[in-house]
Amino acid sequence: MDKKSFETVLDEIRKAVLTEYKLKAIEYVHGYFSSEQVVDLLRYFSWAEPQLKAMKALQHKMVAVHPAEVVSILSCFTFSKDKLAALELLASNIVDAQNSRPIEDLFRINMSEKKRCKRVLEQASKAGCKAPHAMISSCGTFPGNPYPKGKPSRINGIFPGTPLKKDGEEITNEGKGIAARILGPSKPPPSTYNPHKPVPYPIPPCRPHATIAPSAYNNAGLVPLANVIAPGVPPPPPYTPNPAGTDNEDLSSQSKPTQSQTFSTPASQLFSPHGSSNPSTPAATPVPAVSPAKAVNHPSVSAAATGAGMSATNTALAVFPTPQPNTPNPTVIRTPSVPATPVTSTHSTTPTPVPSVFSGLVPLPGLSATPTLPTQASSISRVTLASSETFASTCAPFSGHSSASSTAGSASNPITAPLSSVFAGLPLPFPPASHSIATPTPSVIASAAGPHGVNSPLLSALKGFLTSNDTHLINSSALPSAVTSGLASLSSLPNRNSDSPASATNKCYPPAAVPAAQRSSTPGLAMFPGLQSPVASATSVAPTLPAQSPLATPSTAVPVSCGSSGSLLHGPHAGGISSAPAAATMPVMIKSEPTSPPPSAFKGPAHPGTPVRGTLGLSGALGRGYPTTSVPISVSTCLNPALSGLSSLSTPLAGSMSLPPHASSTPIAPVFTALPPFTSLTNSFPLPGSPSLNPAVSLAGSSTTTTSAAVHPSSATVRSVLPTSNASPAAFPLNLSTAVPSLFAVTQGPLPTSNPSYPGFPVSSAPSGAPTLPSFPGLQAPSTVAVTPLPVAASAPSPAPVLPGFASAFSSNFNSALVAQAGLSSGLQAAGSSVFPGLLSLPGIPGFSQAPPQSSLQELQHSAAAQSALLQQVHSASALESYPAQADGFPSYPSTPGTPFSLQTGLSQSGWQ
């Protein structure tokens, strides 16, 4: 074939994309290829199979080849078996086949191939050469045109779906990209097309505009309040969008929690120590299904479990709660208001439900509703509620652990149980408390917390904290406290994990703000790392907890919870710790916690003792007892109780919450009294429950939603916090405030507000705070509101020291815990940072982080610290390491409930799981 024709063939082969089109380019050729051209063509076929197909196509389009040329063609093949196959195809074109020595030399190695080669060549020599000799090759063809009937690329296209080319069209693809080659020619642009003017109309000048819509999860360019990232916070509880739709909420939450649960289970088991294990397992078990939730919920649990062992309890709680109670809870949760009521109603008995409002707090007390609320984490909460009964049972299991309490709770009333559940770890206790309110609660709580194996772990974690470790103690309020605290702490420890609960809450229910809180909570928890569990509880309560994290911030936490009272509680409890107490039983826990927690966590404070007493006092006592503790709680209603350091709070809380009995409620207010504002808050939380509520209301006002917050922690909280932001937030913010805020965006709001003593409870806010502070130096911060307390906190440092130890201990384990711890402490402290300055400084406490925004926090933290905290706790994070930075920073945006945003940071720990 002449060179020009061969180039045309090669061009057709190059254009073809698929082997079958390349083969068609050969098959359509009119003409004969020389051996050298065959070797060139084979280079365009990648490996043996396509090469052999090409050989088959070339078999009848070749001029006769001599043995030496056959060798060069066969050398294009790598393996002798392919060479043999090619030889069989070439056989009829070989001239002088008798002289086959060079060909046979290619098959020296394998005897069977050598024999086959000989046989093929013998047949070829007998048959003779069928191929034309070189000079005849061009007969009947038009030189330079191997495709008289048209090029294959024109007839068939070069790729399936390619339009066929028309004559006259430029057929070359030179300079075209792969897209142009595959798509084929395109119409020329219209004459009016101006590539430099994309649209035919004038483009208006660009005005400044937001490119990302502000939402609960981000602050799109919004100016941070008080230099906190407040704006978005209160992310609504994403997961449980329907306040009313408990079921749905339940579901969403549930699933999350559930997952969490699953996750948690192990933790529970881990903690099996408390008797919980069973329950926990159950809890976990049931839930397990949901993995994510698990993360959320469980994380806390899990974490908790992990961290504390508490977790189990928590977990169980959480888990259960989650699933079940949704209904009430959700409501509660969803709606701040409702929650309270619903809670109540749900558990009617439990008016406690009111506590529900507290949700965080309440839950413990009681109310299941509350719990639900707190959980908020709606989910949890709701679970709680819904589950209330179930939960109770569940609780019972927990309770089992909780043992009496639990049982009591459970028996007492599902509600309680739910409550418990709400608290998850804590919850348990609470619930009992709630229902039992009276003692059981404590018992429950205690038991839950402590008792449970969880407790144990928890305890152990709390240990110092709980000390009361013994169930008994635990039972006692201390336990609860411890539990809570511990729980919380634990939770926090796990923090992340807890987080998860919180998170769960958080995640599940960002609303609770928990997420943030969660984080916070965790942190709060962290505060009590030991507490982790509590956290878990908290977590459940998560929202609260989160506050918890702040714990010191508890208030804040509360705020966070705020709505999340429960959470708050937790938080508080963790932070205020007392908070729980507020819850009454919880409160106790909390109460104690506050101080204790930090210390406790760190051992130092035994506050738990108080809590214990509180616990007992549960309601009354609680309230009373807690005052101090309360203080922290005070922060939010729940908080309140927690503040309770606010004591009053506590009381009210207790009353309201704990006391489900309303009586308490009333007291609550009084209790708060000191923190009047809190009181209000309290009320609000209690709100749900009772007269106290009134105060709450008032508080609420400030909190605004405190109630709501309580009610819905998330929302309210957020709201409250946020809205109140100034006031409210302040309240929470106080310590938590920041923390909270950070935890919860919502909180955040408050944070800014933080300024006031209790932003959240603006009323009390500062004043309260102050008193509070005094109450517990360490705790007080929370009470105080971040601001003032902080400083105090600073003084509190004592806790810090404690923390530090803890921290260090936890640190390795859970950064988060650490953080939390710090947070706790801090939270406790409010600034926390201050408090534990040594500790992590934790300014970073997540909750705190926001706090800083609070001025108080800042002050507390020294602005800088605060900021860093604000920043994220990051510091703490650093301290924490893993937690690192973000960690709780995100909390601000709980983001979605499920999300692990808040976790994110902590992620490291619980991991997204």
From Swiss-Prot:
Segments for region (Disordered): 233-291, 488-507, 592-618, 888-913
Composition bias, Low complexity: 276-291
Modified sites of kind N-acetylmethionine: 1
Entry comment on modification after translation: Glycosylated. Interaction with OGT leads to GlcNAcylation.
Lineage top rank: taxon: Eukaryota
Comp. bias regions, Polar residues: 251-275, 488-506, 893-913
InterPro entries reported in the protein's UniProt record: DUF4476, PROSER1
The entry's keywords: Acetylation
Keyword Hydrolase assigned: no
Function as written in the Swiss-Prot or TrEMBL entry: Mediates OGT interaction with and O-GlcNAcylation of TET2 to control TET2 stabilization at enhancers and CpG islands (CGIs).
PANTHER family: PROLINE AND SERINE-RICH PROTEIN 1
Description of how the protein assembles with itself and partners: Interacts with TET2 and OGT; this interaction mediates TET2 O-GlcNAcylation and stability by promoting the interaction between OGT and TET2. Interacts with KDM6A. Interacts with TET1.
Protein name (record): Proline and serine-rich protein 1
